[in-house]
């Protein structure tokens, strides 16, 4: 209030101050994070998200050729769009690592023609190319498309669409090489180089552009993390206005 002095106590803790973490675990987390998340979760700073969302990712180093030989499991992630682009990613698993091996990216503005749900379902059929797909993880707002896929016999799961937590989980899995982007996924790699934090919002939120492959990759990562046990993901600390 005006005319009164309000006392405040500021306490600063770092990850090293947590007695519940062994030195080995602390070292693992220190290797896991970079940039803003390192400053927050390791150094204990209240840092704003800025710059590229996946600033640690170097396509020349981190994008990989599609591995030769068979994959054990297959899944597809989908970010639905009619006016905005549609993105589908085909993921194959080998030795505990999931590779994004192929993609469909359809931009109706660029192509000059919108597609129907049935036409998008046909694209999914061609992407799957006869492989046994465990499930299709879809943008939860795409109700009509989800119904079209289910009518065609696809096993569909509505994605967890928590953006801030999903970005952290995706970053963790990329850094751990639990998910790998293959060099065949050109539109996904293009978006990786353009996907930025929106510094105008005052909270952890990316700009709503160059985010279609980014969204479906996030859907896949959240689905994968949800079925894992004993994994680590910080999902409780976020910056708000």
Spans of features found by a protein language model:
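A residue-level signal for conserved active-site and pocket-lining positions in enzyme catalytic cores
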Residues: 13, 42, 79, 88, ...
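ATPase catalytic-site recognition across NTP-hydrolyzing enzymes
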Residues: 18-78
